[in-house]
């Protein structure tokens, strides 16, 4: 789960000031087109240069306004109250030099219209999120961002997207003089990550996904080999699979000591200001980057040292046109990612790197990865032996964050006979609302229509919803009004509500899941994910014939993403997933072994 927009490399103040001086003339093209809209409120025309593409393009054209000069405007859109401003408009077949127009009728976030912008000077930037046309195997034709450009479905970082350099401009909503931006920059390709003695990177062509998407689709893999892999040619190994958001390389594994030039770790400040490790610049300010490198190097030394379980560690790269991650299950909109991972990628890894197979294969992850860990264990109960799901995305849709999609009529507000109350989407440590459901979904609608924002609510629709007549996911709720569609909710329940599925099918699932499930979550999870875990615990504790033998643990006042570590804050424990959960899974495999338990224990 992620409501945080990740930043590309930042542009600092000095660079922006230089750009402002050098490119102030770019605030209007030279010469500007004749003004045929006299008397019309503010209009901003955005075009791209023929030097960037000689052909017409489809996609989403975005206009960014910012009061903050420390980062590029395209990097500053988020659910936080500090978010800067964005507007977005769909374009089909936009030719070079032809403008997409942002006017007062175009939806924005946080302000809904250009008419609501306060007159003043802003850093201004345009971006074209380029779409590809897919002729899918289900007969649908859709226009979506390419899912395999190496950035993990991030519009501000996606290679091939067009943008303009930030420029300082005066914006006045009452002005009738049109403004113009030219997108004359292209985000370059992302270089590959080199292999090392222990870490291997490769891709596997998926026949299933290729058939669905109508063009070649690959699954990426980052594989960490155990110490002694080459010197023990007869050994066969368990497979520990880490699920989570897209990453270009294995995180929290560093083969060299920390960079001595980094800021020292200020642990007291990290605990106070960066308690969960994902508070952005606050973490960097207090030496968090060094802490990350320290923990990564500690894990490397443990991995290669005596006594650590000798296993294969697999991190899967499976971004889709809708998100940085497929959720590792089959979907009408994403395609058969569950089968592709389980029956194509994993067998390839195990056959080429001496894996032991299903009885010594387990999964772990947090947030999105937590849902995936439980999801694949439930969907493929005999193909995985053990799942550790930390702060999982909603695993019971009676607690779809703050919404019961089966009972509630509206996702944005709780409704009474005389009033409505806005629903929170995120809270802080004290329970105070950071962003509402309506605000978070408004942001996504501005970034992309038809579930194409690359955001959290949209990927849930892309994974869980049936495909609509237009080829795009059916909405679980109206993105502007919040009204829930009960027919879509019923489809979600029958196919992806993991607690409901376990309850419904326990007679057959129970014997295959017994003893395999571990859940961890903080009781103050920022996204209310603990509520669904409570409901899961109610079922798992009461399950009979057979009993579930599951474990459920809670962090007393811990936030997102608490993972069962009672001794350390989230900012630290999130960096120790691999050693903690590999050991936990290895102990489970030895306890339930039906095969080789000796060749890999050296």
List PLM regions with ranges:
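Low-complexity, Pro/Thr/Ser/Gly/Ala-rich linker/spacer regions in secreted
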Residues: 31-38
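C-terminal motif of bacterial Sec signal peptides marking the signal peptidase cleavage site
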Residues: 22-25
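Bacterial signal peptide processing site
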Residues: 27-29
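Contiguous beta-strand segments within globular domains
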Residues: 38-48, 54-61, 218-222, 241
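Non-catalytic cap/lid and distal C-terminal segments of serine-dependent acyl enzymes
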Residues: 51, 67-602
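Bacterial N-terminal signal peptides that target proteins for export
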Residues: 2-15
């Amino acid at each position: 789960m992620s409501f945080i927009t990740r930043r590309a490399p930042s542009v600092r103040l000095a660079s922006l000031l230089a750009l402002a001086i050098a490119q102030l003339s770019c605030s209007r093209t030279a010469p500007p087109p004749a003004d045929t809209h006299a008397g019309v409120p503010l209009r901003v025309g955005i075009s791209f240069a023929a030097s960037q593409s000689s052909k017409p393009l489809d996609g989403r054209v975005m206009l960014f306004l910012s009061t903050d000069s420390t980062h590029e405007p395209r990097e500053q859109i988020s659910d936080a109250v500090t978010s800067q401003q964005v507007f977005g408009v769909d374009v089909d077949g936009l030719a070079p030099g032809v403008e997409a127009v942002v006017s007062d009728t175009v939806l924005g976030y946080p302000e809904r219209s250009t008419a609501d912008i306060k007159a003043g000077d802003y850093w201004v930037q345009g971006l074209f999120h380029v779409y590809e046309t897919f002729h899918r195997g289900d007969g649908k034709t859709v226009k979506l961002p390419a899912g395999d450009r190496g950035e993990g479905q991030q519009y501000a970082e996606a290679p091939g997207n067009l943008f303009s350099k930030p420029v300082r401009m005066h914006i006045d909503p009452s002005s009738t003089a049109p403004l113009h931006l030219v997108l004359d920059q292209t985000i370059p390709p992302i270089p590959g990550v080199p292999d090392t003695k222990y870490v291997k990177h490769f891709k596997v062509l998926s026949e299933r996904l290729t058939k669905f998407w109508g063009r070649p689709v690959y699954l990426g893999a980052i594989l960490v080999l155990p110490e002694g892999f080459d010197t023990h040619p007869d050994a066969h190994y368990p497979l520990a699979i880490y699920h989570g958001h897209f990453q270009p390389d294995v995180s929290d594994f560093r083969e060299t000591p920390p960079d001595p030039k980094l800021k020292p770790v200020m642990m007291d400040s990290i605990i106070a200001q960066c308690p969960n490790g994902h508070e952005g610049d606050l973490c960097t300010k207090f030496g968090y980057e060094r802490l990350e490198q320290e923990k990564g190097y500690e894990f490397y030394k443990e991995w290669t040292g005596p006594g650590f379980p000798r296993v294969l560690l697999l991190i899967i790269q499976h971004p889709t046109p809708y998100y940085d991650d497929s959720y590792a299950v089959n979907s009408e909109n994403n395609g058969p990612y569950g089968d592709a991972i389980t029956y194509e990628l994993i067998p390839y890894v195990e056959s080429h790197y001496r894996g032991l197979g299903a009885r010594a294969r387990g999964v772990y992850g947090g947030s999105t990865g937590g849902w995936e860990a439980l999801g694949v264990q439930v969907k493929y109960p005999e193909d995985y032996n053990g799942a550790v799901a930390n702060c999982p995305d909603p695993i019971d849709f009676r607690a779809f964050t703050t919404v019961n999609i089966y009972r509630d009529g509206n996702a944005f507000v709780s409704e009474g006979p005389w009033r409505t109350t806005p629903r929170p989407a995120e809270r802080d440590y004290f329970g105070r609302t950071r962003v509402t459901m309506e605000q978070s979904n408004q942001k996504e609608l501005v970034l992309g229509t038809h579930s194409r924002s690359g955001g959290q609510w949209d990927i849930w629709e892309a994974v869980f919803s049936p495909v609509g007549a237009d080829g795009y996911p059916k909405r679980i709720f109206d993105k502007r009004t919040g009204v829930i569609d009960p027919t879509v909710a019923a489809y979600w329940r029958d196919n992806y509500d993991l607690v409901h599925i376990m309850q419904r099918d326990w007679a057959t699932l129970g014997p295959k899941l017994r003893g395999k499930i571990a859940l961890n979550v903080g009781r103050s999870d920022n996204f209310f994910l603990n509520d669904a875990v409570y409901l899961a615990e109610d079922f798992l504790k009461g399950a009979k014939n057979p009993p579930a033998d599951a474990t459920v643990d809670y962090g007393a006042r811990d936030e997102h993403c608490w993972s069962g570590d009672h001794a350390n804050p989230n900012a630290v424990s999130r960096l120790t997933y691999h050693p903690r959960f590999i050991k936990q899974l290895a102990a489970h495999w030895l306890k339930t072994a039906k095969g080789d338990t000796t060749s890999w224990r050296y």
